[in-house]
Swiss-Prot record:
Miscellaneous section: In Aspergillus, the biosynthesis pathway of the sterol precursors leading to the prevalent sterol ergosterol differs from yeast. The ring system of lanosterol in S.cerevisiae is firstly demethylised in three enzymatic steps leading to the intermediate zymosterol and secondly a methyl group is added to zymosterol by the sterol 24-C-methyltransferase to form fecosterol. In Aspergillus, lanosterol is firstly transmethylated by the sterol 24-C-methyltransferase leading to the intermediate eburicol and secondly demethylated in three steps to form fecosterol.
Motif (Histidine box-2): 186-190
Organism: Aspergillus fumigatus (strain ATCC MYA-4609 / CBS 101355 / FGSC A1100 / Af293) (Neosartorya fumigata)
Domain remark text: The histidine box domains may contain the active site and/or be involved in metal ion binding.
Protein name per UniProt: Delta(7)-sterol 5(6)-desaturase erg3B
Taxonomy of the source species: Eukaryota, Fungi, Dikarya, Ascomycota, Pezizomycotina
Gene Ontology terms: biological process: sterol biosynthetic process
Transmembrane segments: 74-94, 113-133, 152-172, 219-239
GO molecular function: C-5 sterol desaturase activity; iron ion binding
Any Pfam family matching the protein: FA_hydroxylase
């Protein structure tokens, strides 16, 4: 993130802070030469800082400025990536017939987006300290493959990242289903029994932050190339949208894809993993998706939907006690 911050400082934040918090004339003499700025990005490509780099009372290395800049960056980038990927998935992939399911909520799309938009600034504020620690040099991130522990690690870092984060998220997610925690933190995400791509970030903000922690903790524990970290950050966002897209293209006993995660939303206590089914199998929480899900005709047959609804209603009563959701079909019946 230090490389990203160099770029954003040069093109956005230097001028913004100079306008909002201009430096006094004697402060300008105390600041380091602009020659030392952009040291992170300059390892890749030369980027000359503008005159604004020294014209703010908050220098680039000021911890408050770095926190604010990271907060804005995480929020804006996360929002853009969420809206773009979820909208593309909804338009091109999501089976709109799912919106006719008896458990699809009234105004659900609007509610999902609203929940995500409210959660994102809080999640960004909670995540910014971790990125701040990275920027200030406390992580094990490195720039080039030559900085890896050994040559093969350049390739191993990806499966190692997936393995570590999937293990950690499994236990965090399973913990969020504990009765003492579920209703306060995780229930808002399970409001969407029939999820759409917009449900991917429709969390309680603390829930979303908890489940993202393994991604941000990883580079403090293990070496990771900076470019790989940014790429994995984008991949995780897209993957989170994909497992809510309702397109069950992958019938795999290993990959925890959309079908597996749909079972989790349907029936609550299964398939807690994020990427693979290994820890669900070890923990006894794996449930193989029904064959009907992979057939576009059978999945919407009345007998299959009725079977789903009966089990859903039983489990909602078991897990939540009562169902306070407002379903679209119930609204139509009373109108």
């Amino acid at each position: 993130m230090d490389v990203v911050l160099d770029v954003l400082d040069t093109f956005v934040f230097d001028k913004l802070y100079a306008l909002l918090l201009p430096a006094k004339s004697f402060d300008l003499l105390d600041q380091d030469s602009v020659v030392d700025y952009n040291s992170h990005i300059n390892r890749y490509v030369t980027l000359t800082p503008s005159q604004y780099a020294v014209e703010s009372s908050l220098a680039r290395d000021n911890i408050l400025r770095q926190f604010l800049s990271l907060f804005i960056t995480i929020w804006a980038f996360g929002l853009l990536l969420y809206l773009t990927t979820a909208s593309l998935s909804f338009a091109l992939v999501f089976d709109k017939r799912a919106m006719q399911h008896p458990k699809f909520l009234r105004h659900q799309i609007r509610l999902e987006i609203g929940q995500a938009l409210r959660a994102m600034p809080v999640m960004a504020a909670l995540t910014a300290p971790l990125f701040l620690a990275e920027v200030r040099g406390y992580s094990k991130l490195y720039d080039f493959p030559t900085g890896s522990p050994f040559p093969l690690y350049t390739y191993l870092q990806y499966p190692l990242f997936i393995a570590f984060t999937d293990f950690a998220i499994y236990w965090i997610h399973r913990g969020l289903h504990h009765p003492a925690i579920y209703k306060r933190l995780h229930k808002p995400h399970h409001r969407w029994i029939i999820s759409t791509p917009y449900a991917s970030y429709a969390f309680h903000p603390v829930d979303g932050w908890c489940q993202s922690l393994p991604y941000h903790v990883y580079p403090f524990l293990f070496p990771l190339q900076k470019a790989a970290y940014l790429g994995l950050f984008v991949f995780v966002t897209i993957w989170t949208v994909m497992i809510h897209d309702g397109e069950y293209a992958l019938d795999s006993p290993v990959i925890n894809g959309s079908a597996c995660h749909t079972i989790h939303h349907y029936y609550f206590n299964y398939n807690y993993g994020q990427f693979i089914t290994f820890w669900d199998r070890i923990g006894g929480s794996y449930r193989r998706p029904n064959r009907e899900l992979f057939d576009k005709q059978q999945r919407l047959q009345q007998t299959e939907i009725q079977r789903q609804v009966e089990e859903m209603e039983r489990l909602v009563k078991e897990v939540e006690g009562s169902d306070d959701r407002c379903y679209e079909q119930d609204t139509k019946k009373t109108s």
